[in-house]
Regions:
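C-terminal cap/substrate-recognition subdomain and adjoining C-terminal extension
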Residues: 73, 86-232
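Short, acidic loop-to-helix structural element flanking the phosphoryl-transfer center
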Residues: 52-79, 85-90, 124
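Short interface patches used for recognition in eukaryotic signaling and trafficking proteins
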Residues: 17-21, 45-58, 71-77, 110-119, ...
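A structural signal for short, well-ordered beta-strand segments and their strand-loop junctions
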Residues: 29, 78-81, 146, 171-173
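Acidic di-acidic motifs
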Residues: 31-33, 148-149
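Non-catalytic pre-domain segments flanking phosphatase-related domains
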Residues: 1-32, 40-53, 204-207, 213, ...
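A generic local structural motif
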Residues: 14-16, 64-66, 132
Length: 232
């Protein structure tokens, strides 16, 4: 575990100040399943969703929409997923109630759609996609933010950080197989803290979850505030 933050960087309260828009901008690469969409929760359900769960998922959709719009204020957003593009589009509408993903000018890159028919091993999909995206945008961006729930994918991004030091690359590790409230809390937390992450060249972990008196009230922290894995 790396060093703790100095007091002025402690994330005990939301930061509302927006970062200055950079000339070359910021690119967000955000996973879909269990990062924006509560995929594990709905696929592991053996019974139909209750009305409360449906309403929670719609609430998640509203928060995801706000988060994506917030990210778009700072740069370009790409949903980078191993699922199909049709899955992203259908679940965004049918579950989250988000009908304007494309209208938001958010690009969806499906590694499954791009590489499966080419016979490329799945373990290389994200790495190949990342290289292609970087080659396209490297002269247009200053900051790259990668958000994902997969430790394997986060490790791919970390390797990429070491090879490409001309760009500020930060990763955000979401919890694996979150329930709906967990995902809502994670994304709401990022909405108010994303400005701190941009341009930091660090790896952030949303790991620790402590349950409060209200069973629906969770308090999230970045692992030991910040887990500084990357270093020069």
């Amino acid at each position: 575990m790396g060093p703790t933050l100095s007091s002025e960087h402690h994330l005990s309260k939301p930061y509302e100040d927006k970062p200055k828009r950079l000339d070359k901008g910021t690119l967000f690469l955000i996973d879909w399943d269990d990062t924006l969409m509560c995929t594990s929760f709905i696929t592991l359900k053996t019974q139909p969703l209750t009305e409360k769960e449906q309403n929670l998922i719609l609430n998640l959709g509203n928060i995801v929409s706000v988060f994506l719009s917030h990210c778009l204020e700072y740069g370009k957003v790409i949903i980078l997923t191993n699922s199909s593009e049709n899955w992203v589009k259908s679940t965004s509408v049918d579950y989250l109630g988000i009908t304007d993903l494309i209208d938001k000018n958010i690009k969806i890159i499906s590694t499954r759609d791009n590489y499966l028919k080419k016979g490329i091993d799945k373990k290389y999909w994200k790495e190949l996609a990342l290289e292609e995206i970087f080659n396209k945008y490297q002269n247009k961006i200053e900051n790259l933010i990668c958000a994902n729930d997969s430790e394997k994918d986060i490790n791919i991004f970390k390797k990429f950080m070491c090879k490409n030091k001309g760009i500020n690359i930060s990763t955000i590790k979401f919890k694996r197989k979150p329930n709906i409230m967990t995902l809502i809390k994670e994304i709401k937390y990022l909405i108010t803290h994303i400005n701190i992450i941009i341009g930091t060249n660090k790896n952030y972990y949303l790991l620790k979850e402590t349950k409060e008196k209200n069973e629906d009230d969770f308090n999230f922290h970045f692992g030991n505030l910040f887990d500084y894995i990357f270093s020069d």
